UniProtKB/Swiss-Prot annotation:
GO terms for biological process: L-methionine salvage from methylthioadenosine; L-methionine salvage from S-adenosylmethionine; nucleoside catabolic process. Transmembrane segments: none annotated. The lineage of its organism: Bacteria, Pseudomonadati, Pseudomonadota, Gammaproteobacteria, Pasteurellales. Pathway: Amino-acid biosynthesis; L-methionine biosynthesis via salvage pathway; S-methyl-5-thio-alpha-D-ribose 1-phosphate from S-methyl-5'-thioadenosine (hydrolase route): step 1/2. Keywords: Amino-acid biosynthesis, Hydrolase, Methionine biosynthesis. This is 5'-methylthioadenosine/S-adenosylhomocysteine nucleosidase. It is an enzyme of class 3 (hydrolase). PANTHER family: 5'-METHYLTHIOADENOSINE/S-ADENOSYLHOMOCYSTEINE NUCLEOSIDASE, 5'-METHYLTHIOADENOSINE_S-ADENOSYLHOMOCYSTEINE NUCLEOSIDASE. The keyword Glycoprotein does not apply. InterPro entries: MTA_SAH_Nsdase (IPR010049), Nucleoside_phosphorylase_d (IPR000845), Nucleoside_phosphorylase_sf (IPR035994).
Length: 232
């Protein structure tokens, strides 16, 4: 049986390059989510445009896993860089994923941890290593580390300071990965997050995001395509 790879991006711009490469495509639209099933370079894929934010991401990921049954999930798209050695267009790869806007510490949980869930969601090690290998082959600067998710666009020093107080190893922030990881954890489906930096999360990050989202989409898609070639 051929493997099927699930790929998730929040916005149309983040999956456009991948969608245009697909052949034998069928489209399913449900509850605001779009799922494209087909092939990229002879690899079976189910490509989800989930919508922005953790609720949309969780809903879309659940639909993707239930309806198309992928063997693994790659979350792609853009992220805001927090590591000092990251620039726009660089790649971030998850070694763990956490919610930064969850607090149930009153009941003894870690900051960012939801009841009945681990504090950190761990990606599949083989997928992490594959992503790192492909970034090296492509000559792209990549940082592997903690990616944190929350339902806000991080834009300013005060927000960054608050996140770093709790998650001092964070390399990037965005708005969907922890929800995707949580659903994959519940379904026992391996995942990895491979995103490109569209902005450095400072007070001007919203301007950088608008300007460099196409570049981030291009760079992240490049690595995802290279990863898919390992399965064809």
């Amino acid at each position: 049986m051929k493997l099927k790879i699930g790929i998730i991006g929040a916005m149309a711009q983040e999956i456009e390059i991948l969608r245009k490469l697909m052949t034998d495509v069928s489209v399913l639209e449900i509850a605001g989510c779009k799922i494209y099933e087909g092939k990229i370079n002879n690899t079976c894929v189910s490509l989800l445009q989930s919508g922005i934010g953790k609720v949309s991401a969780a809903m879309g990921t659940t639909l993707l896993l239930e309806l198309t049954k992928p063997n693994m999930v790659i979350n792609t798209g853009s992220a805001g860089g927090l590591a000092e050695n990251l620039n726009v267009g660089d790649i971030v790869i998850s070694t763990e994923v956490r919610h930064y806007d969850v607090d149930v510490t009153a009941f003894g949980y870690e900051i960012g941890q939801l009841p009945a869930n681990p504090a950190a969601f761990l990606p599949n090690e083989q997928l992490v290593n594959m992503a790192l290998k492909e970034t090296k082959t492509a000559g792209v600067n990549a940082v592997a580390g903690l990616i944190c998710s929350g339902d806000r666009f991080v834009n300013g020093a005060e927000q960054i300071t608050t996140i770093r107080q709790h998650f001092d190893q964070v390399v990037a922030v965005e708005m969907e990965a922890a929800a995707i990881a949580q659903v994959c954890y519940a379904f026992e489906v391996p995942f990895v997050v491979v995103r490109a930096i569209s902005d450095i999360a400072d007070k001007c990050s919203h301007l950088s995001f608008e300007e460099f989202l196409p570049l981030a989409a291009e760079k992240s898609s490049e690595i995802v395509i290279a990863m898919l070639n390992n399965f064809s």
